[in-house]
Amino acid sequence: MGGQMQQNNAAAATALYDGALPTNDAGDAVMARWLQSAGLQHLASPVASTGNDQRHLPNLLMQGYGAQTAEEKQRLFQLMRNLNFNGESTSESYTPTAHTSAAMPSSEGFFSPEFRGDFGAGLLDLHAMDDTELLSEHVITEPFEPSPFMPSVNKEFEEDYNLAANRQQRQQTEAEPLGLLPKSDKENNSVAKIKVVVRKRPLNKKETAKKEEDVVTVSDNSLTVHEPRVKVDLTAYVEKHEFCFDAVLDEDVSNDEVYRATIEPIIPIIFQRTKATCFAYGQTGSGKTFTMKPLPIRAVEDLMRLLRQPVYSNQRFKLWLSYFEIYGGKLFDLLSERKKLCMREDGRQQVCIVGLQEYEVSDVQIVKDFIEKGNAERSTGSTGANEESSRSHAILQLVVKKHVEVKDTRRRNNDSNELPGKVVGKISFIDLAGSERGADTTDNDRQTRIEGAEINKSLLALKECIRALDNDQLHIPFRGSKLTEVLRDSFVGNSRTVMISCISPNAGSCEHTLNTLRYADRVKSLSKSGNSKKDQTANSMPPVNKDPLLGPNDVEDVFEPPQEVNVPETRRRVVEKDSNSSTSGIDFRQPTNYREESGIPSFSMDKGRSEPNSSFAGSTSQRNNISSYPQETSDREEKVKKVSPPRGKGLREEKPDRPQNWSKRDVSSSDIPTLTNFRQNASETASRQYETASRQYETDPSLDENLDALLEEEEALIAAHRKEIEDTMEIVREEMKLLAEVDQPGSMIENYVTQLSFVLSRKAAGLVSLQARLARFQHRLKEQEILSRKRVPR
């Protein structure tokens, strides 16, 4: 039946689109047959309202067919959809004239309120695109198909939808000849938010001369590290470590292939408000600078090629370049003779680098000159692992800006911080300083070790930011270091990150290589799992009120943090709540009276020790009270034991069994004293811990006061030393002046001797004062050291 109806619908739709209906009477006949195919022959025929052209039927309002029930609306809607689909295949030869276009209703009146927002269901909005694009592959579809009977949407929203549809259609049509731009949002999303690539460098001359072996083997997107190890009995063996990443590049891969695997997929989406970051990580001497050097130049070539396209040149898109470094937690502009920069946040919490000079670039050769100039200014040094090691993080930023119509003279007069133009996209290339282990820096001086500590700190902060970014966390810890603060806008919003891990293949650098690969693996670990930390936390939580008999009060008791000092109190609280919740006619004070009479110790937080109220005398009446516990109490306490968390498990598992046993049998006099002794021991242990904690709390404030006083005295000593240096410089200037005067002919030697004596006395007094302050501080240091040694055992 359904197949026959569809065939009738198709035949009727074909007849409607034949254009062979000369009169309105013939059109009414075909229309009646079309409606009859869906069992809607009783509805009014709207052909008369459309003139002689039946191609306007898909755009008619449903009210034009007369009054309808909900079921009839649905059938009519399906009928109109079939009409539209059949009309699509034969609409090539139809081109609307100016008269017919003017006669059509506006785009807002095409559909009834039941159809608004349902363009993805097959009803094409002819005013949202050109008639020549009806058969184009760029048909705007909705991600879901809403119900045809949804309530009418807002008119403003409908207009915004049409504007967005027109804009997206124009952009896709214009971007077709570019070839580099993505064709759909699906392809944009195909570019991974974070991509980890590993590059293996070849053995260098020094390693070849030492006849070191290559311990890294590459296979597709995975690699294996063959680590040479030695057992306890000095037997040599090889341990294999396998890693898998997005891409693994061996020593034969050129820089051009590295660019195609890392940066090239990101370049087109830079023009879609994307902020990308590419950085190289690895031990010092693993080839980071060699890898990063050609990447910005290739990226500029592709960016300039796109900027020359009419799509962007007509919008006044321009490319800007800046180059700076982070050395020792400070920022320096590499293109302005290492001018010191400041990092600030504006009112919108956007990071601004005050004083950073940006340069508009329009040629690749200009970019090469800027990069060479910046590399010459970059901080380098010699370490135990590399003779010429990068000791700073160099950041090269390429920013695409959309400029407004401004005179060139005005733009030149503006400061570099206030350049006109809105940021469209940005890509940052970061050549990180080499990571190093503390064991390799023993032969370095103090300054080199401080540099290494700052470098490792910033690298760890960068790793945490990338993991938070890949995990879609709400908070990204970009304040961990200056490096991540500067790159804050690259870690939020629409961002992409590419990490190139450079490794050394020789056996001597095996530990460094493993550390680098583990770092990269941690960065990529959350990408593999695809689970956020929130989901993991939700899955790991135990079921809370799963049993319907377990009330909310019981749940609160279960998840209350266990405290050793409240062991008896917790027992009493559970018993009281269970007895109060029971509906049987039992004396509600019975458990409390039993507890007080039976001698179970009540614990006092103020005194910090247990005091048994009375000696235990097990009488028959007490045993009857014990045996009269309701069975509901034991059942509930058994449920409490099942839901209780693992912490405090020993004490909590011991308690619920006892009431259950008491309810089944009489309690002997030997059982209850054992329970009493156990609780007394527990309370005594808790009291001792409480008193120890109290003593520690009493002594901690004095320790803090001593440390604060010592720090204040240290600052005073340093300030006094600085003042003494300034005074000494002033005295030296006075002495130079005296020497110049005494060299003059006719000078008075008596004046020279008197003034020199006064100057030397001042110098000696200052030195004596500084020495006295230094001696006092040394004495305080020794006292503090002795006190700290005494506190260690406790």
UniProtKB/Swiss-Prot annotation:
GO MF annotations in UniProt: ATP binding; microtubule binding; microtubule motor activity
UniProt-listed Pfam families: Kinesin (PF00225)
Annotated stretches, region: Disordered: 525-699
SUPFAM superfamilies in UniProt: P-loop containing nucleoside triphosphate hydrolases
Tissues where the protein occurs: Expressed in leaves, roots, young and mature seedlings. Preferentially expressed in the secondary cell wall pits of differentiating metaxylem vessel cells (at the protein level).
Keyword terms: ATP-binding, Coiled coil, Cytoplasm, Cytoskeleton, Golgi apparatus, Microtubule, Motor protein, Nucleotide-binding
Residue ranges of every copy of the Kinesin motor domain listed in the record: 193-526
Family (UniProt): Belongs to the TRAFAC class myosin-kinesin ATPase superfamily. Kinesin family. KIN-13 subfamily.
Listed name of the protein: Kinesin-like protein KIN-13A
